[in-house]
Amino acid sequence: MRADFLEGVKAGFPSPAEDIHEKLDLIRLLVRHRASTFFFRVDGVSMVDAGMDEGDIIIVDRSVDPYNNCKAVCYIDGEYTVKRVEIGENSARLMPANEHNSTYKPIEVTPENNFIIWGVVTWVIKKM
């Protein structure tokens, strides 16, 4: 998808036609590795303080190596979830980001869990 890309947003009475800088290809901007990038719609409110609201679209890249405190889609015991991942030397903990709702608790990953970090969140797309 390509759209006009405007350099600045003026607070007065601008002429948008004068400010067209180039064509913006959203896929080129948002997707670095096509074969390993996936789009998900957020279902739930456990990550609102991380900027992921219900209904947002997250872009997840499976080729990005997970790192401590990354936001990632994880598979744990038959379910997918998006959380902030605390990665220790021999441990992992999935952290919600919603301080206003005590329903969401950290998930301690143990050797008994069927667990993988499926992919790292690289972008969040919101409707305003």
Region spans (language model):
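Short beta-alpha junctions and helix-cap segments that line functional grooves
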Residues: N69-A72, P106
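PDZ-domain C-terminal substructure recognizer with occasional recognition of PDZ-binding tails
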Residues: T81-E108
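Structural motif
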Residues: G55-D56, C70
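Short, well-ordered loop/turn sites that connect or cap secondary structure elements
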Residues: M52-D53, P66
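Short, positionally conserved secondary-structure boundary motifs
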Residues: M1-V48, E79-Y80, I87-R93, N114-F115, ...
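C-terminal structural segments of small proteins and small subunits
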Residues: N101-S102, P106-I107, I116-G119, W123
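Short, charged beta-turn/beta-strand-edge "cap" motif at the junction between a beta-strand
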Residues: S63-P66, G78-E79
